[in-house]
Regions:
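Cross-family detector of peptidyl-prolyl cis-trans isomerase
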Residues: 2-8, 17-169
Length: 169
């Protein structure tokens, strides 16, 4: 009787382990290593096309398309931007322009949660009327968890136009 009980427990555990392995293999998830490979390929392609890529101290990559004028955005400033957000494969996941006029803006206070770290960091390299492409690694975005339609370990690419900077009073 003891042998049958032990056999049942071992068989059950092995069945559960086998089933969980099948489920893991059936789901294609981006890993951190895959993200880094894809990011490197993306940056290499941008450089090969003549883009000058800079990096913030935290690790956000950016390309200044139009420098803009005035002072750089600072924590506490109220910013108005137009943006389009893409996955690194070019698929758009969001835009301030979707479903509205081309003059739509997204207004927020810089460094005021719930922004992602890479977004806030990227805003600080922009002046009024600047246009910048931000390339934000997942470690500065939604990381290993993802969020909503953003999968885990997903580099985010934003094209941002800084429409206005209202300094903190």
């Amino acid at each position: 009787m003891k042998k049958a009980g032990i056999h049942f427990i071992v068989t059950t555990i092995l069945s559960i382990l086998f089933a969980s392995c099948l489920k893991m293999n059936d789901i294609k998830e981006n890993t951190e290593a895959e993200e880094l490979i894809n990011l490197n390929k993306y940056l290499t392609k941008l450089q090969a096309n003549g883009n000058d890529i800079d990096t913030t101290t935290s690790g956000v990559y950016y390309i200044t398309i139009n420098e803009g004028t005035g002072d750089f955005a600072r924590n506490g400033d109220t910013l108005s931007v137009g943006y389009a957000g893409y996955f690194i494969d070019g698929t758009m996941f969001g835009s301030s322009f979707q479903g509205s006029s081309k003059d739509s803006t997204f207004t927020f206070i810089l460094d005021n949660p719930p922004s992602i770290q890479g977004w806030d960091d990227g805003m600080k390299v922009m002046k009024k009327n600047a246009k910048t492409q931000l390339i934000i690694p997942s470690s500065l975005a939604y990381g290993s968890e993802g969020a909503g339609i953003i999968p885990a370990y997903q580099t985010l690419v934003f094209v941002v136009v800084m429409k206005n900077i209202k300094p903190e009073i």
